[in-house]
Amino acid sequence: MSASTSRRIVEIAHVVITSTKSFAEVRSALESLVPWLDDELRELLRDGVTDRLRQRLEAAPVLSIFESRDHGMLLGLYMHPRGAVQYEIGNPLTASRITRYALGAGLYAPLRVIVYEADNGGSRIEYDLPSSLFDQFGDERVTEVGHALDVALGRALSAAAG
């Protein structure tokens, strides 16, 4: 049996939010506005779909932080480290609503956001607009969820930067 590969070019809308707040202030604000994914939810997800899991997912925040990675420390390999953290942000229930129609959309669920220290002492937040990521799968149900995420993520990140 042989494998096949296909490629296509997709258009992605990239968003940059610039803030006069310091990296530490924006990071702190983001982490207070968007809670970390509940440990109990992680356990329930690991154990499989149950009634308790569904109840918890339906009551969960619209967005949660799944993971974070300190990219600023990596800069220490080449220069002085800076404040830079990448986040995976999303919602397990929302992800399942997307991937049930297009499993490939799991590439982008949860979403990635980076917050970093700008050269001027302020900070920047960058991310790809969810609807533009999900539009490539050609399923309006998936893109529609992406539009809702555009709003939710945009509000949270703008509030953190503001």
Predicted stretch roles:
Residues M1-E58:
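Charge-rich, low-complexity N-terminal segments
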Residues F137-G162:
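Well-ordered alpha/beta subsegment
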Residues I114-F137:
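Beta-strand/loop substructures that line and gate deep hydrophobic ligand-binding cavities in soluble
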Residues E25, G72-L75, T94-R97, D135:
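Short, surface-exposed beta-strand/loop "edge" segments at domain boundaries and coil↔beta transitions
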Residues R82-D119:
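Short, internal acidic amphipathic alpha-helical interface segments
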